[in-house]
Amino acid sequence: MLTNKEIRELLPHRYPFLLVDKVIELEPGKKVVAVKNVSANEPFFQGHFPEYPIMPGVLIVEALAQAAGIAVAVLEDNKGKLGVFAGIEAMKFKNQVMPGDVLTLEAEILVSKLGVTKAKVKASVDGKVAAEGEIKFAMTKA
């Protein structure tokens, strides 16, 4: 388990773009389960959409990428490195994420070679899948 403070030591993201609140399960280099508490005060809800607030899909994908990044950022070889997107594959959006939801972020590292990591990711609310797919990211010197 990682606290928000420990997450901020691993990721360079800060409010309003840090989208992982805590890590509840971590197998370094293999798997992570994290949580994003979706507040009605999120700045993106002002415009997406004021009368029917929905968390933008691209931000769900970003939250998944941040969670997956934590799974490899904790490895000694990646200390001080920055994870940057290299690809999004077969991402499907199945349910909406709204204010008050607790978004569970899961990432399983499939392969990591030549500095590029591929992960299977899933975001869910109360056991219902909101989004799932595969992402790729590269760990680079910051």
Curated annotation (Swiss-Prot):
Its EC number is 4.2.1.59. It comes from the Bacteria. Keywords: Cytoplasm, Lipid A biosynthesis, Lipid biosynthesis, Lipid metabolism, Lyase. The active site is at residue 48. It is found in: Cytoplasm. One of its GO terms (molecular function) is (3R)-hydroxyacyl-[acyl-carrier-protein] dehydratase activity. Signal peptide: none annotated. Belongs to the thioester dehydratase family. FabZ subfamily. This is 3-hydroxyacyl-[acyl-carrier-protein] dehydratase FabZ. It comes from Ruminiclostridium cellulolyticum (strain ATCC 35319 / DSM 5812 / JCM 6584 / H10) (Clostridium cellulolyticum). The lineage of its organism: Bacteria, Bacillati, Bacillota, Clostridia, Eubacteriales.
